[in-house]
């Protein structure tokens, strides 16, 4: 760490993030987590290093996406995370985790980890398979990437345009977050306008 000190910081936050600010954080309890400039606060505490923060599913998506067409990310962990990309550009965040999906249960309550432990892995797999079909109709994605700690628990055959992402992908995604070619949405990060070549 001393030989290679950090120059930038990437944060994947489990909540709704916009312009480096936390809008809501349901898993932490919404009280006290409304419009919080978390990235700015961390930058000050970390010696002024530049900080970028987006939703954690979006960070994982940056590592997985191929940059063509509509790509959707579904993470299976404590809850259900989602991210949407179009031709490599991060689209506005869809917080489907708290949207009703079955018998007034939200995605979190239907395929989150608590639901998996209660329903059992076999039944939970059937639910995830159902969700894949729902997302295919809802988003009409070209590619669906499934990540998160519980992605390894999937036992059914995935459709040809669905793939599992390593749970460590967030590390690479955090690096890609700083590369101009991975940040076409310059409205979100205006400073990312200078192209420096292909990301490797």
Predicted regions and their residues:
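Adenine-nucleotide phosphate-binding core of ATP-dependent small-molecule kinases
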Residues: 1-5, 105-145, 149-200
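Short, acidic/turn-prone active-site loops that include or flank metal/cofactor-
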Residues: 77-80, 96-102, 167-173
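A short acidic Gly-Thr/Ser loop motif
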Residues: 75-79, 88, 149
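Glycine-rich phosphate-binding loop and adjoining helix at the ATP-binding site
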Residues: 2-10, 16-70, 110, 159-180
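Glycine-rich phosphate-binding loop plus the immediately following alpha-helix
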Residues: 38-60, 90-130
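Solvent-exposed alpha-helices and their adjacent loops that cap or buttress functional pockets
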Residues: 64-68, 73-76, 136-138
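Short beta-strand scaffold segments in enzyme catalytic cores
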Residues: 15, 62, 80-86
């Amino acid at each position: 760490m001393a030989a290679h000190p950090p120059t930038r910081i990437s944060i994947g936050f489990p909540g709704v993030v916009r312009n480096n600010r936390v809008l809501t954080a349901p898993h932490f309890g919404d009280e006290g987590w409304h419009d919080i400039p978390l990235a700015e606060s961390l930058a000050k505490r970390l010696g002024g290093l530049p900080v970028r923060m987006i939703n954690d599913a979006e960070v994982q998506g940056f590592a997985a996406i191929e940059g063509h067409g509509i790509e959707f990310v579904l993470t299976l962990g404590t809850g259900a995370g989602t991210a949407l990309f179009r031709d490599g550009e991060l689209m506005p965040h869809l917080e489907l985790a708290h949207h009703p999906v079955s018998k007034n249960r939200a995605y979190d309550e239907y395929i989150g980890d608590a639901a998996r432990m209660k329903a059992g892995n076999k039944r939970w797999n059937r639910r995830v398979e159902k969700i894949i079909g729902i997302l295919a109709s809802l988003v009409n994605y070209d590619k669906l990437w499934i990540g998160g700690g519980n992605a390894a628990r999937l036992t059914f055959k995935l459709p040809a345009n669905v793939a599992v992402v390593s749970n460590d992908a967030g590390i690479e995604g955090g690096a890609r977050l700083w590369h101009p070619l991975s940040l076409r949405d310059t409205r979100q990060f205006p400073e990312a306008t200078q192209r420096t070549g292909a990301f490797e």
